[in-house]
A protein has these predicted regions:
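Short loop-beta-helix segment that forms the pyridoxal 5′-phosphate
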Residues: 155-162, 556-560
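Conserved "HGTGT" condensation-loop signature of ketosynthase/thiolase-family condensing enzymes
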Residues: 1-156, 177-180, 196, 201-225, ...
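Active-site histidine-anchored catalytic micro-motif
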Residues: 171
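A short, small-residue-rich loop immediately preceding and capping a beta-strand
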Residues: 157-163, 185-191, 585-591, 727-732
Length: 750
């Protein structure tokens, strides 16, 4: 394993928001005391007057200024603006198409990871209005990201994760983890959220939107304003950057991720999850007793968030908080959702480069409520900043923080990455065992709940969860929680062990019923309409949020979405998280609910089959071998390895090649793939023929005669584990990617 604890660096930082499309441009505007929260014509919907002749509210938000695309001329702004930021970052890091191809031929392993709150939701709105299949097909995040990466020379895809508004910082942590695991050499961490009616209406119906200027940490703060943002970073080892002549903008010193396990839309008042994330991120400063020279707070200007965040900062720094300058950038650019942490980190890097820290707008901290807060206001503050932190908090209690050091500093300090002690105590990659499994799928031959759809009987879920807590939840959320409960029961975990678990949830479609209900209502009745519960249950990280809330998870939790292989991707990210020592155990869930519109779209796209669609969920408890041994647990199986492969080009041939590589990454005695009757099954068959003989063993498809999205691969993994044999589960995605899991049952000798 190549060492990375001695240094990970950022060699590019591109950002785009309402104040500009370069970090130095954004900073310059902030230093001139500019804000850019005004009319937002890019929001698709309109307000409807409550009565004839009644005034209609103005749509005010912070969108990226309209301009002609330089690259990536595609159907919608997400792909267009994301492509521009990606190309900007690659140019800054001296990574043109030819250079990337040369480095790949020399063995450099590139990966891209994406973070977002709402992904391709704008395409869903367009499709609901125009009925065009092209619009609806672009809804999945894998399609958005593939388009944005076109022409770069990089593989056309990457896992899309969501920790709601903590996605930007979480994406950087995932990128760094891939390098710590020595499974990649250069990561592009991308975070984005286009301005959208779905987000605007959602925050409006939750009554979180301010009518006036944003006033963070003040006594009269009244709410947030929606923004739009894109942030792209290049992450690599310090030694690799030096060898290729790249200039480090900053060094990553640490990061932290946690969960409140408190409430879906309100932070824990004591800020406990955020405090844990901040403490973990800033551990590198502890030996020298230094403090960050600047903190970019999450600071949404909502009463509950600002109070909870102050509690977290106070818990993390104590009385020394008064010596830490804090800024609140959303007061100038709105809340850019999944891109917030990334855009704000890019601005912080510009501030470090220019030795000028931007102040919050419209704000002087309420001294009575926030007595130790040094909030920058009424002008920028000059001075060298060598260490800075960014804090991000999201729906469902997702908390994340990151600490960076200036690229040029006279007195660098050693980084302290999560799991550093565990990595230092072992020279070998630790075995990851499966200690628990929960499966919820309909029985074969069950009566359909709708034409072509199979569902679980309600009694399959009865008694597993708090009936009152789940009564109004989306079916998807109930499935995630129930499967997770079954898995931890099977693993024999106590409450304390469960709280310490990380959580990773994979899904292709999430909660389509509530999502479609909310969207159709706002299209019909205007931006002021919408059920707040339906909005909250529609965000892409709802699975991991409900897993945390339902089971009480307090470590990192996030969702992976938009692909058939999302369950495999969740297992893959969890394995890396465990093998780098960041946590002792993790709960991984794949879940899907059914909906007739989803079935119709898949059929019209040629991705469906005559097999019925089924709802369901599968959950695993993954543990480091040392953790399982220390608590006296019993292994049910082993996650030997995992792989996620993205194609170099589009088309069926590229999909087949991705799957061939995924199979080769985990070659074993048997390979299991999708049902033969499906498009994915046919791609699997082509890949198996292309792969050639595997030697001893068999190859075949999942025997259950139904389709269930991201649940299928994990259901196959559960079958292999329970058989006591060893095998590879290999699955293609319609966007061209492929994933594999190598599973070994406890009775297997191979």
């Amino acid at each position: 394993v190549r060492a990375a604890d001695d240094g990970l660096v950022l060699t590019a930082a591109a950002a785009s928001c309402s104040l500009g499309e370069h970090r130095s441009e954004i900073l310059a505007a902030m230093l001139e005391d500019q804000t850019a929260i005004d009319e937002a014509p890019a929001i698709e919907g309109v307000f409807v007057a409550e009565s004839p002749g009644a005034p209609v509210p103005m749509i005010r938000a912070a969108q990226v200024p309209e301009s002609e695309p330089k690259v990536g001329a595609v159907a919608d702004r997400a792909e267009k603006l994301l492509s521009r930021s990606i190309h900007q970052a690659l140019a800054e890091a001296s990574l043109d198409h030819q250079t990337i191809e040369r480095m790949q031929s020399e063995g450099t392993r590139f990966e891209t990871v994406f973070g977002t709150t709402l992904g391709g939701m704008r395409h869903l709105g367009a499709g609901l209005r125009n009925g065009r299949l092209e619009s609806l097909s672009r809804t999945t995040t894998a399609t958005v990201t593939r388009t944005a990466l076109a022409g770069t020379g990089l593989p056309l895809g990457g896992s899309t994760v969501s920790a709601a508004c903590a996605s930007g910082v979480s994406t950087l942590a995932i990128a760094a983890t891939a390098i710590l695991a020595d499974e990649a050499d250069l990561l592009m961490a991308v975070s984005y959220d286009p301005i959208s009616e779905f987000a605007f209406a959602g925050f409006t119906c939750l009554r979180l939107v301010s009518e006036g200027p944003l006033r963070p940490f003040t006594a009269d703060r009244a709410g947030m304003r929606l923004g739009e943002g894109y942030g792209v970073f290049i992450v690599e080892r310090a030694g690799d950057a030096q060898a290729r002549g790249a200039r480090p903008l900053a060094r990553i010193l640490g990061w932290g991720g946690a969960s409140d396990a408190h409430h879906l839309t309100q932070p824990a008042p004591d800020g406990r999850g955020a405090a844990r994330a901040i403490r973990e991120a800033t551990r590198a400063l502890e030996p020298s007793q230094r403090l960050p020279g600047l903190i970019a707070a999450h600071a949404t200007s909502t009463p509950a968030n600002d109070a909870a965040e102050y509690s977290a900062l106070s818990a993390a720094f104590g009385g020394r908080l008064r010596d830490v300058p804090v800024t609140a950038l959303k007061s100038r650019i709105g809340h850019t959702l999944g891109a917030a942490g990334a855009v704000e980190l890019a601005v912080v890097l510009a501030a470090m480069e220019q030795s000028k820290s931007p102040a919050a707008a419209n704000a002087e901290a309420d001294g009575e409520s926030f007595p130790d807060l040094d909030l920058l206001h009424e002008g920028s503050r000059a001075g060298c900043v060598e260490h800075a932190a960014v804090v991000s908090l999201g729906f469902g209690g997702a908390d994340a923080a990151i600490l960076v050091e200036a690229g040029e500093t006279s007195d660098p300090i050693p980084p302290h990455f999560p799991g550093q002690a565990a990595r230092a105590s072992s020279t070998q990659r630790e075995t990851i065992l499966i200690s628990g499994c929960g499966v919820l799928v309909p029985e074969v031959g069950k009566t359909p709940v709708r034409v072509g759809e199979l569902g679980l009987d309600d009694d399959a879920l009865d008694g597993l969860d708090d009936a009152r807590a789940v009564r109004r939840l989306a079916r998807f959320s109930r499935l995630v929680r129930a499967a997770g409960i079954l898995a931890v029961q099977d693993a024999g975990l106590d409450d304390q062990e469960i709280r310490a678990c990380a959580g990773f949830v994979g899904t292709r479609f999430g909660a389509p019923e509530y999502t479609l209900d909310f969207y159709q209502e706002l299209i019909r009745d205007g931006l002021g309409a919408g059920n707040p519960l339906h909005f909250a249950e529609s965000v892409p990280n709802i699975g991991s949020a409900q897993l945390s809330l339902g089971l009480g998870l307090e470590a990192l939790t996030l969702s992976v979405g938009g692909t058939v292989i999302a369950g495999i991707e969740a297992m893959h990210l969890a394995r890396r998280h465990l093998q780098t020592g960041q946590v002792d155990r993790a709960i991984v869930v794949a879940a899907e609910e059914t909906h007739p519109m989803v079935r119709k779209i898949l059929h019209d796209l040629g991705h469906g089959s005559e097999l019925p669609n089924t709802e369901g969920a599968v959950a695993f408890v993954l543990e480091r071998e040392s953790s399982l041994r220390d608590r006296g647990g019993v292994a049910k199986g082993e996650l030997v390895d995992s792989a996620v492969i993205w194609p170099a080009s589009g088309g069926t041939h590229a999909s087949v090649e991705s799957l061939v590589r995924a199979i080769s990454e985990g070659a074993a005695q048997s390979v299991v793939g999708p049902p033969a009757e499906t498009l994915a099954g046919r791609v699997f068959g082509l890949a198996m023929r292309r792969r050639g003989p595997l030697g001893v063993g068999t190859r075949g498809s999942l025997s259950r005669p139904f389709e269930n999205g991201s649940v299928g691969p994990l259901l196959a993994a559960a079958d292999v584990m329970r058989s006591g044999q060893a095998g590879v589960i290999a699955w293609p995605d319609s966007a061209g990617g492929a994933g594999s899991l190598k599973i070994r049952g406890v009775s297997s000798e191979s």
